[in-house]
Amino acid sequence: RICHSQMSSQPPTTTFCRVNSCYRRTLRDPHDPRGTIIVRGCGCPRMKPGTKLECCTSDKCNV
């Protein structure tokens, strides 16, 4: 699987993953209460309740 693997503030990058899924996690920016940070990567990790997590299973699906 090919997944995007960067934070929202970084230029787009992709990586080849051994697992069959990608994720996109959205969390609040601690420095800006109105802002959010988006983190992308391989797999579908378990998150604490209240964290927005989207998992998908096609190449580059976590845009």
From Swiss-Prot:
Its main location: secreted. Pfam families: Toxin_cobra-type. SUPFAM superfamilies: Snake toxin-like. Transmembrane segments: none annotated. GO terms for molecular function: toxin activity. CDD domains: TFP_snake_toxin (cd00206). It is found in: Secreted. Expressed by the venom gland. Gene3D superfamilies: CD59 (2.10.60.10). It comes from the Eukaryota. Disulfide bonds join 3-22, 17-42, 44-55, 56-61. One of its GO terms (cellular component) is extracellular region. The keyword Secreted applies. Negative results: has no effect on M3, M4 and M5 muscarinic acetylcholine receptors. Monomer. Blocks M2 muscarinic acetylcholine receptors (CHRM2). Fully blocks the binding of N-methylscopolamine (NMS) and oxotremorine-M to M2 receptors, slightly increased NMS binding to M1 receptors. This is Muscarinic toxin 2. It comes from Dendroaspis angusticeps (Eastern green mamba).
